[in-house]
């Protein structure tokens, strides 16, 4: 299975054990000013799903031997929507780094 199908399957099936397995031991997640480790990430995602988080519009941007990038819309419990862009750097066939940018879909971007 390729990287994209693996990640989509983990999200769609809420497979936390599979998530734990695919994250490299040196894994780090970076979002704005947040930096978390592998174990913290699994707990964080599990709690978010338990709180009602859902994913929509999963869209592949690029996949190659070193990275995977995609965009999605996250919907929080209560209906708050965020568009996220996710870039994963892979190491030893596992996710080594996640860099995520988030945009509030209720706010108008000024360019």
PLM regions: where:
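Amphipathic alpha-helical repeat scaffolds
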Residues: 4-9
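Short, hydrophobic/aromatic-rich segments at coil-to-beta transitions
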Residues: 1-3, 24, 65-71
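Short, well-ordered alpha-helical segments enriched in acidic and aromatic residues
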Residues: 11-30
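A beta-strand edge to alpha-helix "cap/lid" segment located at domain peripheries
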Residues: 12, 35-36, 40-111
């Amino acid at each position: 299975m390729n990287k994209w199908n693996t990640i989509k399957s983990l999200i769609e099936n809420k497979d936390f054990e599979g998530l734990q397995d695919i994250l490299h031991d040196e894994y780090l997640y970076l979002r704005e000013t947040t930096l978390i480790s592998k174990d913290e990430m699994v707990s964080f995602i599990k709690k978010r799903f338990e709180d009602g988080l859902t994913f929509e519009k999963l869209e592949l941007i690029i996949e190659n031997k070193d990275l995977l990038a995609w965009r999605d819309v996250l919907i929080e419990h209560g209906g708050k929507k965020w568009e996220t862009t996710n870039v994963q750097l892979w190491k030893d066939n596992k996710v080594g780094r996640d860099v995520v940018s988030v945009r509030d879909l209720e706010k108008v971007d000024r360019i």
